[in-house]
From Swiss-Prot:
Stated name of the protein: Ion-translocating oxidoreductase complex subunit C
Protein source organism: Shigella flexneri
Family statement: Belongs to the 4Fe4S bacterial-type ferredoxin family. RnfC subfamily.
Residues reported to bind [4Fe-4S] cluster 2: 387, 416, 419, 422
Origin: domain of life: Bacteria
PROSITE patterns: 4FE4S_FER_1, 4FE4S_FER_2
Topology versus the membrane: Peripheral membrane protein
Gene that encodes it: rsxC
Annotated keywords: 4Fe-4S, Cell inner membrane, Cell membrane, Electron transport, Iron, Iron-sulfur, Membrane, Metal-binding, Repeat, Translocase, Transport
GO BP terms: electron transport chain
Molecular-function GO terms, alphabetical: 4 iron, 4 sulfur cluster binding; electron transfer activity; metal ion binding
A Pfam cross-reference name: Fer4_7
SUPFAM superfamilies in the record: alpha-helical ferredoxin, Nqo1 FMN-binding domain-like
Length: 740
């Protein structure tokens, strides 16, 4: 009983929801054997004829190529393309390809030499002795991709299946109207197709192998049954004709009763599907050693005089194939690549044949009927009834028109197989498939942009983390590479620390002085003397660093002399205007005298420290002499006009005498330091000597006429002198600081 149920289930088929039954229109071509087409003069081979990235070019312009020679390198999911014939590479440039957008893609353009020479072919007749990995790599490097329309790399698909494939399905349904490429291939090359199926089974090691074929192909069914007559490992399943039974998910459900989950793949349920044409290409790649350079293409439509199926070289322009079949275009002729439901209109006929090209349809105006204008949706739900994937095309249509990408994704627009059944039954003639294609392309672009943004964010975060790590490493390296003191430096540091500790200990100890003893200030005195010595050494060092050849500024000396003269004039005016009865404070007079003496000594030191090379400007000396003579005359006039009873203050007289002596010494030193070549006017010298003698006599008379009774307090004079010395010392230190 169990065996009976197993046998019943083994031959059981399931039916999917939806689907349509359009006119088949296959009789135009399925009765004509396969034929070859004359070679074209130019071939355009796009680098990307599959799902995935294009390969890396390995030829250059001007290279000679042979048929089957790789034009690109296939790495990872990149599938290589091969030269369809022998010739010369004339260009590598963008060219429009077989795509609904007709966008230009990078292509290799070859001029055929007409010889059609192959590369050396190395076939693996005993393929069973090869490992699974070797077979998959050979299939991949020979450019085999899904020839049913998807174009997925076959090697990658076999590698992804692994050991979890239990059922291998060969899709021979070919359900779309007009297309008979697989039908004719099975009629003419059934043995090679079965041999390719056995190679795939050897790689995957499935539990069962199923061939699904529609019942509208009786000749192909009979040829396959004849080849499989003595075989028990491959089962041929004939299914009812219904569109789209050839869809991967639909055929999987029909043969196994299993449904592929949303967003999943057939390998998730242990099923792997390959096309009949793909199995034939695998046989030629493994056993014959021939890369895929041609495929079967159906040329059909009432605009073609000789419809049929031909072996078309990849890269052959569509125009060349149509002309070979007797193409008779009308005024508004349309050429469709693919079937009438899933195909797309070509913008021009220079598009090349690629791996996924299975049909070229050139219908007449009678076949297409009158074009009908798109109308508004009437919500009849006919599209939902016809959908084989149980979607809601009406809702997806509104979401696509409204750019509501999230809602379209939620309603599983990605599961749409673009079969065109919804558009076929739509009474409003709405091209639903075009809307869905555009919406899926926009969603894919948005996801690609989001992926790029996420990758950029990840790169930025990784960069920030790397910078933080480098910063932490750098700080750690700086800490570890800090300067370590040498042995002698350590000793010095230890000694300094010991001295500091000793001083701190001494500072914390209380100072006790016995009665009758004086405190020991020797340390403080020594420190003070050390600071003084350090200051003197610093001053000496500063004096030594000065350049010996530097000439002292005469302007500074002149300014000091002018200040002294100004003070002298001011003092004389004060004396002349003073009242006879005005008494001067003797303490102030003593202080002024001390200040005058300090200034005089400071001036003498500056003159004594002046460099011997210092030169005195004779013009300035003459000016100073004239000023001195004017002062002398003014003083004589003041003395002549003074009252005989006026008493001169001896303190002021002493100050004036000191100033006069300082000026006299300054003048003598300037004359002594003058150049020996410089001659002094004798008349001026005599005048200056006379003035000096007059001042001296005047001073003597003033001192003689001074009151004998007036005595200066010696204590006050001493205090004034001390103050004067302190101020003089402070002025000297300030000068040193200013010079520094």
């Amino acid at each position: 009983m169990l065996k009976l149920f197993s046998a019943f289930r083994k031959n059981k088929i399931w039916d999917f929801n939806g689907g349509i039954h359009p006119p088949e229109m296959k009789t135009q071509t399925n009765g004509t054997p396969l034929r070859q087409v004359l070679l074209a003069q130019h071939f355009v081979i796009p680098l990307k004829q599959h799902i995935g990235a294009e390969g890396e070019l390995c030829v250059s312009v001007g290279d000679k190529v042979l048929r089957g020679q790789p034009l690109t390198r296939g790495r990872g999911k990149m599938l290589p393309v091969h030269a369809p014939t022998s010739g010369t590479v004339t260009a590598i440039a963008p060219h429009s390809t077989a795509h609904p957008s007709a966008l230009a893609e990078l292509s290799v353009i070859i001029d055929a030499d007409g010889e059609d020479c192959w590369i050396p072919r190395d076939g693996w007749v005993d393929y069973r002795s090869r490992s699974r990995e070797e077979l998959i790599e050979r299939i991949h490097q020979f450019g085999v991709a899904g020839l049913g329309g998807a174009g997925f790399p076959t090697g990658v698909k076999l590698q992804g299946g692994g050991d979890k494939i239990e059922t291998l399905i060969i899709n021979a349904a070919e359900c779309e109207p007009y297309i008979t490429a697989d039908d004719r291939l099975m009629q003419d090359c059934a043995a090679q197709v079965v041999e390719g199926i056995r190679i795939l089974a050897h790689i995957l090691q499935p539990r069962e192998i199923l061939i699904g074929i529609e019942d509208n192909k009786p000749q192909a069914i009979s040829m396959l049954r004849a080849v499989l007559a003595d075989s028990n490992d491959i089962s041929l399943r004939v299914i009812p004709t219904k569109y789209p039974s050839g869809g991967a998910k639909q055929l999987t459900y029909i043969l196994t009763g299993k449904q592929v989950p949303h967003g999943g793949r057939s390998s998730d349920i242990g099923v792997l599907m390959q096309n009949v044409g793909t199995a034939y290409a695998v046989k030629r790649a493994v056993i014959d050693g021939e890369p895929i350079t041609e495929r079967v293409v159906t040329l059909t439509g009432e605009a073609i005089a000789r419809p049929g199926n031909v072996w078309a070289r990849l890269g052959t322009p569509v125009r060349h194939l149509l002309n070979d079949a007797g193409f008779c275009p009308s005024a508004d002729q349309m050429v469709i690549m693919g079937g009438p439901l899933m195909g797309f209109t070509l913008p021009w006929l220079d598009v090349p044949v690629v791996k996924i090209t299975n049909c070229l349809l050139a219908p007449s105006a009678n076949e297409l009927g009158e074009p009908q204008e798109e109308q508004s949706c009437i919500r009849c739900s006919a599209c939902a009834d016809a959908c084989p994937v149980d979607l809601l095309p009406q809702q997806l249509y509104w979401f696509s028109k409204g750019q509501q990408h999230d809602k379209a994704t939620t309603h599983n627009i990605a599961d749409c197989i673009e079969c065109g059944a919804c558009a076929w039954v739509c009474p409003s003639n709405i091209p639903l498939v075009q809307y869905f294609r555009q919406e899926k392309a926009e969603i894919a672009a948005i996801r690609q942009e989001e992926k790029r943004a996420a990758e950029a964010k990840a790169r930025f975060e990784a960069r920030q983390a790397r910078l933080e790590r480098e910063k932490a490493t750098r700080l750690e390296r700086h800490k570890s590479a800090a300067v370590q003191p040498a042995a002698k430096d350590k000793d010095a540091i230890a000694a300094a620390l010991a001295r500091v500790k000793e001083k701190q200990a001494q500072a914390t100890q209380p100072i006790v002085i016995k009665a009758g003893e004086r405190p020991d200030n020797s340390a403080i005195i020594a420190e003070r003397e050390a600071r003084k010595a350090q200051a003197r050494a610093k001053q000496a060092e500063l004096e030594q660093t000065n350049d010996a050849a530097t000439v002292a500024e005469p302007r500074k000396t002149a300014v000091e002399a002018a200040i002294a003269r100004s003070k002298a004039r001011k003092l004389e005016q004060q004396q002349a205007n003073a009242e006879p009865e005005e008494q001067v404070d003797p303490r102030k007079a003593a202080v002024e005298a001390a200040i005058a003496r300090a200034k005089a000594r400071k001036l003498e030191q500056q003159q004594a420290n002046a460099e011997p090379e210092e030169q005195v400007d004779p013009r300035k000396a003459a000016v100073e002499a004239a000023i001195a003579r004017a002062k002398a005359r003014k003083l004589e006039q003041q003395q002549a006009n003074a009252e005989p009873e006026e008493q001169v203050d001896p303190r002021k007289a002493a100050v004036e005498a000191a100033i006069a002596r300082a000026k006299a010494r300054k003048l003598e030193q300037q004359q002594a330091n003058a150049e020996p070549e410089e001659q002094v006017d004798p008349r001026k010298a005599a005048v200056e000597a006379a003035i000096a003698r007059a001042k001296a006599r005047k001073l003597e008379q003033q001192q003689a006429n001074a009151e004998p009774e007036e005595q200066v307090d010696p204590r006050k004079a001493a205090v004034a002198a001390a103050i004067a010395r302190v101020q003089a010392k402070k002025a000297a230190q300030q000068k040193v600081v200013n010079e520094d």
